[in-house]
Design a protein with these regions (language model features):
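Transition segment at domain starts
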Residues: 27-48, 170-176
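Bacterial N-terminal signal peptides that target proteins for export
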Residues: 1-7
Length: 183
C-alpha cells in the first residue's frame, strides 16, 4: 500500500510540475545611482620591468563632483594619491616625490582627446553609457608620474550609500582602454 501511495505521489508531482509554463528570467538590474561611492581595490601593476602584486587602493567618488584614489603598498605606505575634480587633476607620487597639479584642459590637450570628470567616472565604473565615440583609434594609457603602467583592479567592497554594502568582483576594463597622445 505504501509503495502504491509513494508511486502515485511521485507521478502526481511529475505531472504537476512538468506541464507548468516556463518562467521568464529576471531582467538585469538597472544601473545603481549613487551620491557617494567608496570601493576598496586590490591592484596588480607592472612597470619598469617589475610586477607589483601587493598594492591596494581606496576609491572615493562623488557623482559629478570628485574622484579620489589612494594607492598603498604593504604596511599601509601610501604610494600614489590622485584627485580629479571638475576642472583639475592633482597627482602625488610618494615614491618619486613628485606631484602634478594641472587643469583638465591642459591634460586633455596633452592626451589629444577630450577629458572630463564624467568621462573619468564612466571609465572607472565601467559604464559605457555616455562615452564619446572613438573612431578607428587605438588608445593607450600612460600615466604622467608613474611611467608606463598596466593595472588590473579588483573592487572588493562597494558602498553606494551607507545602507547598501555588497561584495562585488568587477573586472575593470580600463586595462583595455589606453589613452595616447596624438602624434
Amino acid at each position: 500500500m505504501r509503495a502504491r501511495f509513494f508511486i502515485a505521489f511521485v507521478a502526481f508531482l511529475l505531472l504537476a510540475t512538468s506541464c507548468a509554463s516556463r518562467k521568464k528570467t529576471v531582467a538585469p538590474a538597472p544601473p545603481q545611482s549613487f551620491e557617494w561611492l567608496t570601493a576598496n581595490m586590490a591592484i596588480q601593476a607592472e612597470g619598469n620591468g617589475m610586477v607589483y602584486n601587493d598594492l591596494s587602493g581606496q576609491l572615493r567618488m562623488r557623482k559629478d563632483s570628485l574622484v579620489w584614489l589612494n594607492v598603498t603598498a604593504t604596511m599601509g605606505v601610501e604610494v600614489l594619491r590622485v584627485k580629479v575634480s571638475n576642472d583639475s587633476v592633482w597627482i602625488v607620487n610618494r615614491i618619486e616625490k613628485t606631484y602634478l597639479a594641472e587643469p583638465l584642459d591642459t591634460i586633455s590637450a596633452q592626451l589629444g582627446m577630450p577629458l572630463s570628470l564624467p568621462l573619468v567616472q564612466t571609465l572607472l565604473l565601467d559604464n559605457n553609457q555616455g562615452l564619446p565615440p572613438v573612431e578607428n583609434q587605438t588608445v593607450q594609457l600612460k600615466t604622467f608620474v608613474m611611467g608606463e603602467l598596466s593595472a588590473k583592479i579588483r573592487y572588493n567592497n562597494i558602498r553606494l550609500n551607507e545602507k547598501t554594502t555588497f561584495p562585488l568582483k568587477i573586472t575593470d576594463k580600463m586595462e583595455r582602454i589606453r589613452l595616447l597622445k596624438k602624434q
